[in-house]
């Protein structure tokens, strides 16, 4: 267990670090959200700033399928084939494993590839499966609305705040949306993520972390966005950390996320009682 004292002093250290990094002109915007998952303190930095979620939306997409699978377990063994003809969105962080053309995959295999390797080809197959059926498409929309990811008036899902996205991990951790089996399935896949930079790099290797990153690059204005959010399973006192960034250089954004992860872990570790 760790102390539940205020994080005010640490917040000032974090703010100082962020201000220094913003002077480099490589970091344009950043949001940070922290929550002690054992009824402890919460703090946020620019937590209502909006970012493009990109691959972060793979988590709620997987939640749509597992929500259905609670009542239709056969859904996870249903097989679909990847033709390889659809355009796959560009990824700065290339997946180490990806769905292969002219190959049959079960829904569960595609869900796993989507989260562990952030594979866009697998995501495309899952989205096509949803889009082919009006009832499935409606279920996706209703699920996203329930998770607070779509404004019911505008049907827009173009932007997301760090606080809003972090709530998904609280739902999974507290088993508040999916049942225990399905919540654990998602968290285990996220714990197997092959993205070893960002949050993961700021935490000792023996500490489990279930996280998802998202990245977006616009060639028109040379602006990059990189985000990493997850649960760090500090012994007997897990915590939630989510960092969203916008800047000109992916390496800089990765470095900033890693350093903030290090700062938070060291602060949490110093509070051990």
What label would you give each PLM region?
Residues 19, 26-50:
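Short, conserved catalytic-motif segment at the N-terminal edge
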Residues 59-64, 164-167, 259:
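Short amphipathic alpha-helical face segments that pack within enzyme cores
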């Amino acid at each position: 267990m760790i102390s539940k004292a205020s994080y005010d002093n640490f917040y000032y250290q974090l703010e100082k670090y962020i201000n220094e990094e913003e002077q480099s002109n490589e970091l344009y915007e950043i949001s940070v959200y922290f929550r002690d998952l054992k009824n402890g303190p919460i703090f946020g930095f620019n937590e209502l700033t909006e970012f493009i979620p990109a691959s972060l939306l793979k988590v709620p997409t997987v939640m749509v399928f597992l929500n259905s699978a609670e009542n239709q377990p056969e859904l996870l063994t249903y097989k679909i084939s990847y033709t390889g003809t659809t355009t796959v969105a560009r990824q700065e962080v290339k997946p180490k494993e990806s769905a292969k053309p002219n190959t049959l995959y079960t829904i569960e295999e595609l869900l796993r590839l989507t989260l562990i390797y952030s594979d866009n080809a697998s995501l495309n197959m899952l989205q096509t499966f949803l889009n082919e059926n009006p009832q499935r498409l409606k279920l996706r929309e209703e699920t996203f609305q329930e998770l607070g990811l779509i404004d019911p008036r505008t049907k827009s899902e173009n932007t997301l705040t760090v606080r809003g996205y972090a709530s998904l991990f609280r739902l999974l951790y507290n088993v508040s949306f999916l049942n225990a089996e399905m919540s654990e399935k998602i968290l285990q896949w996220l714990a197997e993520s092959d993205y070893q930079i960002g949050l993961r790099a700021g935490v000792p290797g023996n500490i489990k972390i279930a996280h998802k990153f998202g990245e977006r690059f616009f060639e028109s204005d040379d602006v990059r966005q990189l985000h990493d959010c997850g649960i760090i399973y500090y012994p007997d006192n897990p915590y939630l950390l989510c960092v969203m960034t916008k800047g000109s250089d992916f390496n800089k954004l990765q470095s900033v996320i890693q350093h903030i992860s290090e700062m938070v872990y060291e602060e949490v570790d110093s509070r051990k009682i």
